[in-house]
């Protein structure tokens, strides 16, 4: 009789947490910048605060698309690192710079001409003017943000996640005084309001980019990589094709996920501000808690890729299931706390008792949502480690847009199945679609892991 070696899973779980914790803290620091921008701009006027929110609905989907293209690098680099082919890592990083050069211009143009979207949506003139100014300022930091991500992916790929954490916290520390100067007009500089947030963010992005590059150039653990010996090399279309085959599905999946929640808010807006507010409370809470499994998923990508590079398919499997076990244990805790303190959580955001009651109901659904969300993001992270990103895209598109959105809309806005449920209908759709996604991603992961090692590694060698 064959027994499971739980000690091996325990070892991999510890390594996962060591990689995931800095990723989590970096995410908290990054999200805190957005919170600081919202709070500080809100002290100027409600229009300035609204401009940050409206601008973010344009900025994040597009920038996350560019970010997603570069997420092909961590599994590629971790595989090379694990297989002892560190001399090939620099080439991948340099080709990542070409991905930035090819993507930055179209993304920048789309952001610059976002006024066309605002005209179509008939956004109020004053709000539109502030939002466009904010986005135009942010564009100057776009190349820096993507360059920083490129070199962060290098560090993540070799399982060095602490530098990004430290640099992001330094960026947060700089963001606050720069906001103070540019939003309110200090040190002889005019008051720019929300546009000042965009200026500050662009400067912070360049600051973090320079720090990240300086670290990579001087870190002892990267000297043998010789990334900067010839930082600019000709585009290698074979390498670029392989990276984009991995990164493009991730980019589209990220874009579609962000777009799903943005569209949900728009579809709820005719139902009144109270319903939109309750939805936003549940979404903000879920987004904050989502950072926990997301960090585990990113750590799983790195460690699965490294184990596969070492030729240890059994250890890659142990990493996948260790991440799932840890993630579900965390989900039990966070879901329980969400249920117990749902009213108190809602009271952090608003004082209106009707909104608190509606948000409390949505948070009950959100507690259930956390289990499916954990499984799908961790399984997706493991699949990225196996370089199987197209399956993630197909499953995401099917579950979110063929199942989740139609079901959510039907339950929320129509009487076809039952009286319209409002925001609850969309959240039920989220739970159902995420549960299906989690199931399909687990099936896909198990199918890949069931392959004979020779076939698995032959496929991975073609993708490196």
UniProtKB/Swiss-Prot annotation:
A GO biological process held by the record: monoatomic ion transport
Function: Multidrug efflux pump.
Protein keywords: Antiport, Cell inner membrane, Cell membrane, Ion transport, Membrane, Transmembrane, Transmembrane helix, Transport
Protein's recorded name: Probable multidrug resistance protein NorM
Molecular-function annotations in GO: antiporter activity; xenobiotic transmembrane transporter activity
Membrane-protein topology: Multi-pass membrane protein
Residues that span the membrane, as ranges: 16-36, 51-71, 97-117, 129-149, 164-184, 194-214, 248-268, 285-305, 321-341, 355-375, 391-411, 423-443
Disulfide bond residue pairs: none
Family: Belongs to the multi antimicrobial extrusion (MATE) (TC 2.A.66.1) family.
CDD domains assigned to the protein according to its UniProt record, in alphabetical order: MATE_NorM_like (cd13131)
Any coiled-coil regions, as ranges: none
InterPro entries the UniProt entry points to: MATE_fam, MATE_MdtK, MdtK-like
